[in-house]
Structure formats: C-alpha cells, structure tokens
Swiss-Prot record:
Coiled coil: none annotated. GO terms for cellular component: membrane. GO terms for molecular function: cycloeucalenol cycloisomerase activity. The keyword Transmembrane applies. It catalyses: cycloeucalenol = obtusifoliol. It is found in: Membrane. This is Cycloeucalenol cycloisomerase. Its main location: membrane. The chain crosses the membrane at residues 22-42, 53-73, 89-109, 167-187, 201-221, 244-264. It comes from Arabidopsis thaliana. InterPro entries: Cycloeucalenol_cycloisomerase. The keyword Flavoprotein does not apply. It is a multi-pass membrane protein. The gene is CPI1.
C-alpha cells in the first residue's frame, strides 16, 4: 500500500487518507471471509454461546485498530497518531455506528419487524456482537463510497454545478440503497436475524436502512479530503454526532408519519409518542 501522493481518479490526494482507505479495503476480505465465508455457510454459529459470538466480533473488529498501529504506513510515519487518517476514520465510524446500534436498532424492531434471536450479551437490548461487526462493515461501506464519489467528481468536474449536484445526489441514493440491499441479502442465510416479512424488508426496509448512508456517505467523504483542511479529532467526533442526529430525526419522522412496514406483534405501537428505545 503506497503512500504516494501521485494523482489518481479513485484514490485520495492526501497520502495518509489514501493509505488508510487502502488498508481498510485490503482488510475487508479477512473479516468478510471469516463471517460469511466460514461461520455462516458451515453453520458454526449453531454451537456458539454469548462468548463465541462476542469473540467473533472482536476478532473481526480489533485488527482494524491494531494492525495500522503496528504496521505504520509510510505516509503516517511523520504524523502524530491523532493526525493519521485511519484514527480519524475509526473514530467517526465508532461514533456513528454506536448511535446506530444503541438507538436505531430499535427502529428496526419497531418499524421493520426485525429481531435478534442468537444468544448474546446486550446493551439496551442490542447484542454487543453487532456493535463490533457494524464497525468493520461501516468502515468498508464508507471507504467504498469515498472512492466512487471521488471518481464521480473527477468525471463531472467540467459540468455545471447544478448537474454535478444532481449526479452526486443520484449516485449517493443508488449506492446507499444498493449497499443496504446487499447487506440484507448477504446475511439472509443467518437464521437468527429475523424479519416478520423478509420480502417487505427487501422492497421497502432497505430504503429505510439506506437513510443511514444517504446522510453519512457525503459527510464522511469530507474528512481530510482537502489537504488544506485537515480535521482534528474533536471535529471528527462532532461531525459524526451531527450525522447521527440527522439520521435519528429522519428515522423518527418515518416512524411517526409512515409507520411500520409490517404488522407489529400485539402490544407494540410504532406510532406512539416518545422514542422507540424508551418503550421496550
């Protein structure tokens, strides 16, 4: 993984950001193969207890922090640890995915009819396992979005601003829905993440899930994209919290005005006042 700053239509001009994005891309096959290439197809999860599920998540997520600390990229050797892109990217995703798991999972329960039935230790009725697995998933999704958005901007550089905006908005919408749909399909063979109506989840629920990325992809892209505007960690955290708040507002507006996509079990009222994680 080169730290070179030579021009590229796909890769970041910032050497640290370029190295970080390439690292996250090259790391993705490890956890993806472990989870979807070994554990799920061979049904190893059938013997898992709470501990094994948590260990699987830790083995998937922890190297995203440890490897770049031990194998420092050429582009990062002259930088303080807090100025390295991989640190900032991890922090942004930690904040965003934590809010997503702790709060938005309850929208999946109340609006999409989802449920987790595998053995797990939980926080706010959300498995600890999902906090860690979501982190590496979202790192991959957002880096992939960065690369494609950068390429799109190069392709539309000579167009009027209004057309550039339209192309970018259309791409973000399409990519967000595609990733939401792809993830739903990818975990379909895992029987302990259930939906009341899986076909409704594929048709409509993926659009609900895509809201996460419609907000987060363009916001995450901005971080350290311009060499004259490098972010510090406090700005990274505040930006991620801002993105998370906007997603929360949109999800709750869906809950109140559009309601659930499936009939809810007796006793669950999606349209009640208040917030869904207060009423389990």
């Amino acid at each position: 993984m080169s730290g070179s700053s030579s021009p590229s239509l796909w890769l970041a001009p910032n050497p640290s950001k370029r190295w970080g994005e390439l690292f996250f891309l090259f790391y993705t096959p490890f956890w993806l193969t472990l989870c979807l290439g070994i554990v799920v197809p061979y049904k190893l999860y059938e013997t898992f207890t709470e501990l094994e599920y948590l260990l699987l998540a830790l083995v998937s997520a922890v190297p995203a922090f440890v490897i770049p600390m031990l194998l420092v990229g050429k582009a990062d050797r002259s930088l303080c640890w807090k100025d390295r892109y991989w640190v900032k990217a991890n922090l942004w995703i930690i904040v965003f995915s934590y809010v997503g798991n702790y709060f938005w999972t309850h929208y999946f329960f109340k609006v999409l009819g989802a449920s987790y039935t595998f053995p797990s230790w939980k926080m706010n009725n959300v498995p600890h396992t999902t906090f860690f697995l979501t982190h590496v998933c979202f790192l991959f999704y957002h880096v992939a979005s960065n690369i494609t958005l950068r390429r799109l901007r190069h392709s539309t550089a000579d167009l009027p601003d209004s057309l550039k905006w339209c192309f970018e908005a259309a791409w973000i919408l399409a990519l967000s829905y595609f990733i939401a749909y792809l993830e739903t399909i990818a975990i379909a063979n895992f029987p302990y993440y259930e939906f009341v109506d899986r076909s409704a989840m594929y048709r409509v629920g993926c659009l609900f899930y895509a809201i996460y990325f419609i907000v987060s992809f363009p916001m995450f892209f901005r971080m350290d994209e311009k060499s004259t505007d490098e972010w510090d960690l406090s700005r990274v955290a505040v930006d991620a919290l801002g993105a998370a708040m906007l997603v929360t507002i949109i999800l709750d507006l869906w809950r109140l005005f559009l309601g659930p996509i499936v009939p809810l079990p007796e006793g669950q009222n999606c349209l009640q006042s208040g917030l869904p994680w207060f009423s389990n």
